[in-house]
Every structure is written in C-alpha cells, then in structure tokens.
Amino acid sequence: MTADTTRRAAAGRPGRSVKTAAAIATVTASLLLLSACGDQTQAAQARREAAKNRNPHAPLFSKLPKDVQDKAMLQVGSDITYKPVEFRSNGQVEGIDPDLAAAIGKELGIKLNFNNATFDTLMGGLKSQRYDIAMSAMTDTKDRQQGIDSTTGKKIGEGVDFVDYLNVGVSLYTQKGKTQGIDGWETMCGKKLAVQRGTVSHDLAKEKSSSCESSGQQPISIEAFDNDSEAQTRLRTGGVDAVSSDYPVAAYAVKVSGGGNDFQMVGGAPLKAAPYGIAVPKGQEKLRDAIKAAVELVIKNHAYDGVLAKWNVKDAGVKEVKINGGS
C-alpha cells in the first residue's frame, strides 16, 4: 500500500463521519418533528373530545374545578366484573354504576369514562392520579377514608372522601317455590348455605352458625365458593337450601336467572347494610361537592329511581346523600 493510498483512506474517514453525523441529525430532527406532530394531534383530539362532552349549560357545570371543566371528562377507576353493579356486555360497560355515572355526568355537563382495573389497585390509581375518582361497589369505611390498610392497620396513603350513593346489605335467596321453611337467618339453623368465599356473607354465615350452636340448634352447613355464580349453580341444582350475597347481586340473580323462575328472595330487609361510595381523593373538595350535588339532583329528578328499578335494587336506594357516612 502506497503512502498516497494510506492518506486517501485516512482523508476519507472525516468525510464519512460528517455525512453520518448529518444523517443522524436529519433523522433526529425528523423524529422530533413527528413527536411534535403526534403531541399536537393528541392535543387536538383531546380538545375535540372535550368539546363533544362539555355542556357548559348543565345545571352543575359551574361547580366543577376549572381543570375538569377544561377536559370535560372524569376518568373513573372500576373493577368491571361485578354484575349487576358494573360489568361488560357486548363490549359495553353496563350496570348500576355506569348508569348512575351517566346521569351524574349529565347534570355536571361532562363525561364519566370507566377504566377497568382490579379492585385492589383502585386506591393506588387514585393516589397516582391515574383515575380522578373510583366507582366500583366500594364500601365506604373509616379505614379507606383515612388511608389505612384494613389488613395490617398501617397508613398507606392520604385516604379518600366518599360520596355515598347506595346502601347495601346482605340478602338470602332460595330456589323459587322451595324455601325449605327459610324466611330469614333465624330459620337457617341446620340448613345448607352457599356463599362466596371471604365476603361479608361468608362472615355473617359463620357468625349466625355460631349463634345457632349457642342456642342448642344445629349449625349452618356452609359451602364457600370462589364466586357467586358457582354458589348460584349449587342452589339451582339443589345442593344447598339457600345462597347469601350482597343485595344487588342477589336481587339481580332473582330477576334474571331462568327468566326469573329460578330463585326467590327470603328474609326481608338485607342485613349488615353499609354505604357504597364514590371515592374522591383527599384535597379535591370542590370536585367532591360537585359530585354530591349531582347525585342529589339525580335523586330529585327521579333518574336515580329509574336506574334502581331497571336493575331491581330499589331497596338499596338512599334519600340523603352523605359525605363519609360509613363506619
């Protein structure tokens, strides 16, 4: 190899480096431009969506915080697996909570958009601002208000405020026309009962069974299942005498299973009644109060009654909307 050849090779490297650098700069600029265009497109879509959802003439629009007015939407965290409170049907979110949320949104002049998540992640989602509120058959408790883990007793967050909108207890139901003499928990001694494992119904059944034994009667034979559907199947096939579930779940099963011919409610008013609440992060008092006013208006104009009648849960209705009414 000659000196000239070596020099030409050496001399060529800077040229290629310059070209490479120029190419990288061009690509980088293009990516930045695309990113900027993408951001602008998303922003434009958000503005169009807000314009579509926003109704500044709605009765309570002016009560909302400015940022909520601007985006005209609240992101709702919800575990959409709990028929009939919230569930999916043909790709759509349906149930008591979505219907009430639509009525609430109408009074606020915005849209409430449901996002599916497991129940145990909802409080964390509020804390991280992934969701603006949570509406998911969530019982209003002091622990949740104060941000305390009920299992460990440790404080894990600032907590939430609840706008209470339903009052839900535990119900009993049997095969239709085959009550086996059951007309309430007092007549369950010596009977077979199916429940969902780890629920309030399960705890109440064990409590009532102990009472049976204390009074010299036979205990309740309790069969615990992973979900209410399995418990209902056990009742339908005659394996147990009754099922206990949260009132909305029980009422829905009585209404729809077998066209309303499979089950019947027994025992009168639900026991262990406690409020379901819409969870709003602490420090969002203006949003909380606007939602409370919207629920009150939905009750006043009877849209509330219509939703509860549709889902056969009229007994769960409230007359007064409370903030943090749970214990």
Q: Where are the predicted features?
A:
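C-terminal motif of bacterial Sec signal peptides marking the signal peptidase cleavage site
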Residues: 32-36
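Bacterial signal peptide processing site
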Residues: 38-41
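Extracytoplasmic small-molecule ligand-binding "clamshell" domains
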Residues: 46-138
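Acidic, polar ligand-binding/catalytic clefts
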Residues: 111-186
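A ligand-binding cleft/hinge motif common to bilobed small-molecule-binding domains
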Residues: 138-155, 206-207, 237, 241-272
